[in-house]
C-alpha cells in the first residue's frame, strides 16, 4: 500500500474499494502536461523568492523536465494508489530526485494546483476550438460565394414559405457560428486567470510572487480572491454552456442536411466519406455522421446540467464533489472539436443539386407574398391584398394550378390593379432579387453579407 501524503492523521488505511472509488487518475491523465507546466512555474517562483534555494529549484526543475520527457515517450504508468494526477507526477519526480521532491509542494495545495491545471487545459482547448470554428465559418462563406444565385424554398413550419437564395440560408448559420465564436472568445477571458498561489483556500504565509507565476504561465491576470480561485468552476460552466449552444446550432444544420439529402428533397448529396451503408439493404447510403452530431448534442447538454447540479449546493470552498468537474469538460471538448471537423468536411464535400432546389420554388405557392406585396405597392391595404391572394390560392389549389398559371383575365377579375407585369413579379428569381433590404435574401444583400463576413474572418 502506497503511503498517502495526508496519512499522518490516520491510523487505518483506505478500504480498497473506497480507494478506487475516490481515485481520479483514470480520467485526469490528460492533465499531466499541464500539471508539469504549473509545477515548473511554481518551483521557479519558489527559487526566485528565496523560499527554497536556487540549487534546490534547479534540481527540482530538472527532475520535472525528465518526468515530462518520460510522459512524452509514453513511459509514465498512472497508478490508482497515487490517487490523482498531482501525486502521480510527484511520485515520478521523487523517483528522479529523491526526498527533495517534497519541497515542490511548499506554498501550494492540490486545490490551487488542480484549478491551475484546468485553467491551462481549457485555455488550450479554447484555442483549438476557436481555430476550428473559424475554419467552419470560412467554409460556409466559401460555399455561399458559389451559391448566391442558387434558389431554394425558404421554410416556416417546414412548409414552403418564400423563395430564397441558398447562400442566404448558409449565411444564417455563419451568423450563428460567429456568435458562438464570440461567446468562446469571452470564455477565454474568464479562463485566462491564474489561481496558483491561492493554496488550500486562504493563501499562504510564504512570500510567494503570484504575478511571476502568472507571467510564467502566460495568464492574463491573477485571481484576486483565494477562496474564489479554488472553489468556483464558472469558467468550465461557461464553456459547457457555450458548447451546448454550439452543438444546438450544429444539430440544427445536421437536421437540415438530413432532410435535404433524403430522396424526397434531393437538394444535396453527402460524400461517401461521411456516409455509411446498411447490413441488410444494399441500396442504402445513410448520413450517419450528421445523425451522430445531432445525437451527440444530447451528451453535451447533459454535461452542462450535470456540473450545474454538482455546483448548486456547494459551500465555499473546496469539496470533493468538484472531482466531478472534469469528465464532462473533457467529453464536451472532445465532442465539439470532432463535430466541428466532421461538419466542415461534410459541407466542403457535399454536392448541391441546384436544379432540384430551384424547381422546388416553382411548384408551390411561395410567391403568394409577392402578389400581396404587388397589390399593396399599388395602393391596396395589405390586409385586403392578403385576403384576396388567400382566396385566389384556395381556388388554384382546387383547380390544380399555380399562381403563375392564372390567366391575366382571371387576375384582373380579382383586381383591376393587376397588370401583365405580374408574371415577372411571380418568378422565383425576381422575387429573390428584389428583397435587398438590409439582411434580406436579395442577391445584392447577400453579396454584402459575404463581404462583411470576409472582413470579420480577416481579424
UniProtKB/Swiss-Prot annotation:
> What domain of life does the UniProt record list for this protein's source?
Bacteria
GO CC terms: cytosol
Could you tell me the EC number(s) of this protein? 4.3.2.1
Q: Which UniProt keywords apply?
A: Amino-acid biosynthesis, Arginine biosynthesis, Cytoplasm, Lyase
Enzyme kind, highest EC tier: lyase
Q: Name one GO biological process term.
A: L-arginine biosynthetic process
The entry lists its GO molecular-function terms as: argininosuccinate lyase activity
Q: Which SUPFAM superfamilies match?
A: L-aspartase-like
Query: Which Pfam families does the entry link to?
Result: ASL_C2, Lyase_1
Cite the annotated pathway.
Amino-acid biosynthesis; L-arginine biosynthesis; L-arginine from L-ornithine and carbamoyl phosphate: step 3/3
Q: Where in the cell is it found?
A: Cytoplasm
Recorded catalytic reaction(s): these are: 2-(N(omega)-L-arginino)succinate = fumarate + L-arginine
- Can you tell me which family this protein belongs to? Belongs to the lyase 1 family. Argininosuccinate lyase subfamily.
UniProt name for this protein: Argininosuccinate lyase
Q: Which gene encodes it?
A: argH
Amino acid at each position: 500500500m502506497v503511503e498517502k501524503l495526508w496519512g499522518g492523521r490516520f491510523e487505518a488505511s483506505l478500504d480498497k474499494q473506497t480507494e478506487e472509488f475516490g481515485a481520479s487518475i483514470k480520467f485526469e491523465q490528460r492533465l499531466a502536461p499541464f500539471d508539469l507546466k504549473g509545477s515548473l512555474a511554481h518551483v521557479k517562483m519558489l527559487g526566485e523568492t528565496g523560499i527554497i534555494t536556487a540549487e534546490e529549484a534547479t534540481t527540482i526543475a530538472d527532475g520535472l523536465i525528465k518526468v515530462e520527457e518520460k510522459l512524452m515517450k509514453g513511459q509514465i504508468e498512472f497508478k490508482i494508489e497515487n490517487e490523482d494526477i498531482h501525486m502521480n507526477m510527484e511520485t515520478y519526480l521523487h523517483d528522479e530526485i529523491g526526498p527533495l521532491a517534497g519541497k515542490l509542494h511548499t506554498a501550494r495545495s492540490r486545490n490551487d494546483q488542480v484549478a491551475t491545471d484546468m485553467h491551462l487545459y481549457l485555455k488550450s482547448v479554447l484555442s483549438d476550438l476557436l481555430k476550428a470554428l473559424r475554419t467552419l465559418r470560412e467554409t460556409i462563406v466559401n460555399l455561399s460565394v458559389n451559391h448566391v444565385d442558387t434558389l431554394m424554398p425558404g421554410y416556416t413550419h417546414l412548409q414552403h414559405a418564400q423563395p430564397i437564395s441558398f447562400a442566404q440560408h448558409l449565411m444564417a448559420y455563419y451568423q450563428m457560428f460567429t456568435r458562438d465564436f464570440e461567446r468562446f472568445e469571452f470564455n477565454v477571458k474568464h479562463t485566462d486567470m491564474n489561481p496558483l498561489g491561492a493554496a488550500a483556500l486562504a493563501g499562504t504565509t510564504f512570500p510567494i510572487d503570484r504575478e511571476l507565476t502568472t507571467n510564467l504561465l502566460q495568464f492574463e491576470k491573477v485571481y484576486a480572491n483565494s477562496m474564489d480561485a479554488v472553489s468556483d468552476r464558472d469558467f468550465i460552466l461557461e464553456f459547457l454552456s457555450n458548447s451546448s449552444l454550439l452543438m444546438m446550432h450544429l444539430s440544427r444544420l445536421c437536421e437540415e442536411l438530413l432532410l435535404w439529402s433524403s430522396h424526397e428533397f434531393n437538394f444535396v448529396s453527402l460524400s461517401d466519406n461521411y456516409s455509411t451503408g446498411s447490413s441488410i439493404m444494399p441500396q442504402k447510403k445513410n448520413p450517419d455522421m450528421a445523425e451522430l452530431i445531432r445525437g451527440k448534442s444530447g451528451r453535451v447538454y447533459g454535461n452542462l446540467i450535470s456540473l450545474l447540479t454538482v455546483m448548486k449546493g456547494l459551500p465555499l470552498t473546496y469539496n470533493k464533489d468538484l472531482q466531478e468537474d472534469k469528465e464532462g469538460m473533457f467529453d464536451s471538448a472532445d465532442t465539439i472539436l470532432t463535430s466541428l471537423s466532421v461538419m466542415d468536411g461534410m459541407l466542403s464535400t457535399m454536392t448541391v443539386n441546384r436544379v432540384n432546389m430551384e424547381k422546388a420554388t416553382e411548384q408551390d405557392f411561395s410567391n403568394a407574398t409577392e402578389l400581396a406585396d404587388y397589390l399593396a405597392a399599388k395602393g391596396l391595404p395589405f390586409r385586403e391584398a392578403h385576403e384576396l391572394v388567400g382566396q385566389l390560392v384556395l381556388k388554384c389549389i382546387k383547380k390544380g394550378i399555380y399562381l403563375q398559371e392564372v390567366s391575366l383575365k382571371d387576375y384582373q377579375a380579382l383586381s383591376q390593379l393587376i397588370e401583365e407585369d405580374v408574371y415577372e413579379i411571380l418568378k422565383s428569381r425576381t422575387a429573390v432579387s428584389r428583397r435587398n433590404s438590409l439582411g434580406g435574401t436579395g442577391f445584392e444583400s447577400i453579396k454584402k453579407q459575404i463581404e462583411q463576413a470576409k472582413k470579420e474572418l480577416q481579424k
